[in-house]
């Protein structure tokens, strides 16, 4: 989990929606699998890989460096876009950044099937 701050409280829904369009793409079938979610816990906000969410629910999952790297790269991109600020304490632990995910533009959203492998609250 990467602790973040929102620039404005209303940015929560923007970040949540944007994350639905970031992940692993199957270009042939035009399906995008969401990699990360925004989590609010005890008044703090986090960018969390879906496998971390499964693990918090007590499920056995294999999460590797590439998963963490993808999460960290997505968080960095959200920060570059001005949607979030990564907490300094979290910044120290970021994995090397990479471009191992796809971002679907808002305009392209209706052309793709967006799938989440985890649903918060279920």
Swiss-Prot record:
Keywords: DNA-binding, Repressor, Translation regulation. Residues 15-37 bind DNA. Controls the translation of a number of proteins (such as regA itself, rIIB and at least 35 others) by binding to their mRNA. This is Translation repressor protein. Changing residue 72 to G: 100% activity loss. One of its GO terms (molecular function) is RNA binding. Signal peptide: none annotated. GO terms for biological process: regulation of translation. The keyword tRNA-binding does not apply. It comes from Escherichia phage RB69.
């Amino acid at each position: 989990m990467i602790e973040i701050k929102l620039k404005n409280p209303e940015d929560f829904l923007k970040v949540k929606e944007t994350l639905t369009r970031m992940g692993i793409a199957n270009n042939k079938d035009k399906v995008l699998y969401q990699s990360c979610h925004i989590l609010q816990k005890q008044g703090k906000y986090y960018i969390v890989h879906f496998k971390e969410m499964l693990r918090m629910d007590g499920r056995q999952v294999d999460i590797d460096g590439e998963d963490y790297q993808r999460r960290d790269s997505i968080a960095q991109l959200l920060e570059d876009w001005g949607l979030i600020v990564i907490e300094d304490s979290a910044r120290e632990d970021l994995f090397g950044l990479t471009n191992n995910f796809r971002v679907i533009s808002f305009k392209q959203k209706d052309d793709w099937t967006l799938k989440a492998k985890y649903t918060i609250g279920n």
